[in-house]
UniProtKB/Swiss-Prot annotation:
Leader sequence residues: none
Other known facts: Ido1 and Ido2 are 2 distinct enzymes which catalyze the same reaction. Ido2 Km for tryptophan is much higher than that of Ido1. Ido2 may play a role as a negative regulator of Ido1 by competing for heme-binding with Ido1. Low efficiency Ido2 enzymes have been conserved throughout vertebrate evolution, whereas higher efficiency Ido1 enzymes are dispensable in many lower vertebrate lineages. Ido1 may have arisen by gene duplication of a more ancient proto-IDO gene before the divergence of marsupial and eutherian (placental) mammals.
Gene label: Ido2
Highest taxon in the source lineage: Eukaryota
Official protein name in the record: Indoleamine 2,3-dioxygenase 2
Pfam families on file: IDO
Phenotype of gene-disrupted mutants: Knockout mice have no apparent defects in embryonic development or hematopoietic differentiation and have wild-type profiles for kynurenine in blood serum and for immune cells in spleen, lymph nodes, peritoneum, thymus and bone marrow. Knockout mice exhibit defects in IDO-mediated T-cell regulation and inflammatory responses. They exhibit defects in allergic or autoimmune responses.
Documented activity regulation: Activity is inhibited by D-1MT (1-methyl-D-tryptophan) and MTH-trp (methylthiohydantoin-DL-tryptophan) but not L-1MT (1-methyl-L-tryptophan).
Organism of origin: Mus musculus
Source taxonomy: Eukaryota, Metazoa, Chordata, Craniata, Vertebrata
EC annotation from Swiss-Prot or TrEMBL: 1.13.11.-
Expressing tissues: Expressed mainly in antigen-presenting immune cells, liver, kidney, brain, and placenta. Highly expressed in kidney, followed by epididymis and liver (at protein level). Detected in the tails of the spermatozoa in the testis and in the kidney tubules (at protein level). Constitutively expressed in brain.
Needed co-factor(s): heme
Length: 405
C-alpha cells in the first residue's frame, strides 16, 4: 500500500522508485488496471458508461440503485487506484449531470461511503484528482507499441467525445515528456553531493530539453481538443465544491459526515512535475501562490508529495551554483529557468484560448446552460486563473541568476 503523506527520511542517493515514480513512465501509473474483481461490477458497469448515462440524464437514477459494497476485496494498490478513479468519475457525473445550475448536493451513502474509504486508504481526497483523470486513466491499444496518441485510449470518460480523449491523453504525453527531466533532477542532486560539475552540467542540459519537450507535448492540445467543447461540455465535470460559486457550501457525503465537505476540482497544479522542477531549481513563488500550490499537494499520491518535500530539504542547487561562481553550470541553470518560464507562458496562452476566449464566445451565443459561467474566471481547482498563472511565471523568471553573481 502507498505510504501516507508525511515525508520520508531523505536518503542518498535519491531514487525515483522509492517514491513510486517509474523510470519509464514518471508519475504515470505504469500499465493501469482496466477491471476490478467481480464484486465491484456495479461500480464499473456505471463508470464505463458515463458519457451515455450523463447525456441521457440517467446517471443519478443508476447511482441511487447502486448497492453499498464492501471495500475489503480490493487487495492491491492498483485495484485501489482504479476503484478511486471509477468512484471519483461517477461522483463528478452524479453531481454535475444537470450542469452547474442544478448540482446534486448530497452524495448517496452507497457511493459516498466506499469512495471515502478508498480515498483514506490511498491518502487522496474523495473527489476526482489529476492522478485519476490522467495518471491512472490510460492504456495502450497495442501493448508493444509506443506511448503516443494513436496508440493510447482512456479507460473512463465523460461527455466530450474526441476532445475529452485528446485532453486526457495529451496530458498523459506531457507527463511522459517529463520523465527525462525527473531522471536529470535525480542525477543533478547526486552531482551536487559528489561535487561533480560535469555531471551537474549534463543533468541541467537534460532538464532543459525535457522542459522544452513538455511544451511541445502541450502544444498537441490544439490538435486534439476543441476549445468550445472543452469549455461548454468537459470543464464542468472537472469542477469541485470548494471556492465554487455553484456549490458554495460544499457536498454532503451521506453516511460519512453530516456537514458538507469542500474539495477543490481538478487542476494542472495537482501534477507533481512542475512542483518537482520548482523545488530543484529553487524557484520561490509569492505567498498566495504558494498557499494554493501546497494545498494541491494534498491532492497528489502521498509518495509523490513526499518526493517534493524531500526535494525541498535537499541541498540547494542555487546555493551550489552561486558558490561555484560564473561558468557553464550557471548558464545551464538559467537556460532551465528560461525554458520553464516559456512553458508557463505557453500554458497561459492555452488557458486563454480554452477558457477565456471560449467563455466570451459562449456568452455571445447566449449559452447560459450548460456552460459553467460561475467558473469563467476561475480554474476548476478554484483559483483566479490568469493572475495566478502570471504570478507563477513572473516568479519563475525572477529566479534567473546574474552571471556575475
Amino acid at each position: 500500500m502507498e505510504p501516507q503523506s508525511q515525508s520520508m527520511t531523505l536518503e542518498v542517493p535519491l531514487s525515483l522508485g522509492r517514491y513510486h515514480i517509474s523510470e519509464e513512465y514518471g508519475f504515470l501509473l505504469p500499465n493501469p488496471l482496466e477491471a476490478l474483481p467481480d464484486h465491484y461490477k456495479p461500480w464499473m458497469e456505471i463508470a464505463l458508461r458515463l458519457p451515455h448515462l450523463i447525456e441521457n440524464r440517467q446517471l443519478r437514477a443508476h447511482v441511487y440503485r447502486m448497492p453499498l459494497l464492501d471495500c475489503r476485496f480490493l487487495k492491491s494498490y492498483r485495484e485501489q487506484r482504479l476503484a478511486h478513479m471509477a468512484l471519483a468519475a461517477i461522483t463528478m457525473g452524479f453531481v454535475w449531470q444537470e450542469g452547474e445550475g442544478q448540482p446534486q448536493k448530497v452524495l448517496p451513502r452507497s457511493l459516498a461511503i466506499p469512495f471515502v474509504e478508498v480515498s483514506r486508504n490511498l491518502g487522496l481526497p474523495p473527489i476526482l484528482v489529476h492522478s485519476d483523470l490522467v495518471l491512472t486513466n490510460w492504456t495502450k491499444r497495442n501493448p508493444e507499441g509506443p506511448l503516443e496518441i494513436s496508440n493510447l485510449e482512456t479507460i473512463i470518460s465523460f461527455p466530450g467525445g474526441e476532445s475529452l480523449r485528446g485532453f486526457i491523453l495529451v496530458t498523459v504525453l506531457v507527463e511522459k515528456a517529463a520523465v527525462p527531466g525527473l531522471k536529470a533532477l535525480v542525477q543533478g542532486m547526486e552531482a551536487i553531493r559528489q561535487h561533480s560539475q560535469d555531471t551537474l552540467l549534463e543533468a541541467l542540459q537534460q532538464l532543459r530539453l525535457s522542459i522544452q519537450d513538455i511544451t511541445r507535448a502541450l502544444a498537441q492540445m490544439h490538435d486534439y481538443v476543441d476549445p468550445d467543447i472543452f469549455y461548454s461540455v468537459i470543464r464542468i465535470f472537472l469542477s469541485g465544491w470548494k471556492d465554487n460559486p455553484a456549490m458554495p457550501v460544499g457536498l454532503v457525503y451521506e453516511g460519512v459526515a453530516t456537514e458538507p465537505l469542500k474539495y477543490s476540482g481538478g487542476s494542472a497544479a495537482q501534477s507533481s512535475v512542475l512542483h518537482a522542477f520548482d523545488e530543484f531549481l529553487g524557484i520561490e513563488h509569492c505567498k498566495e501562490s504558494v498557499g494554493f500550490l501546497h494545498r494541491m499537494r494534498d491532492y497528489m499520491p502521498p509518495s509523490h508529495k513526499a518526493f517534493l518535500e524531500d526535494l525541498h530539504v535537499a541541498p540547494s542547487l542555487r546555493d551550489y551554483i552561486l558558490a561555484s561562481g560564473p561558468g557553464d553550470c550557471l548558464m545551464a541553470y538559467n537556460q532551465c529557468v528560461e525554458a520553464l518560464g516559456e512553458l508557463r507562458s505557453y500554458h497561459i496562452n492555452v488557458v486563454a484560448r480554452y477558457i477565456i476566449s471560449a467563455a466570451t464566445r459562449a456568452r455571445s451565443r447566449g449559452l447560459t446552460n450548460p456552460s459553467p459561467h460561475a467558473l469563467e474566471d476561475r480554474g476548476t481547482g478554484g483559483t483566479a486563473m490568469l493572475s495566478f498563472l502570471k504570478s507563477v511565471r513572473e516568479k519563475t523568471m525572477e529566479a534567473l541568476l546574474c552571471p556575475g553573481a
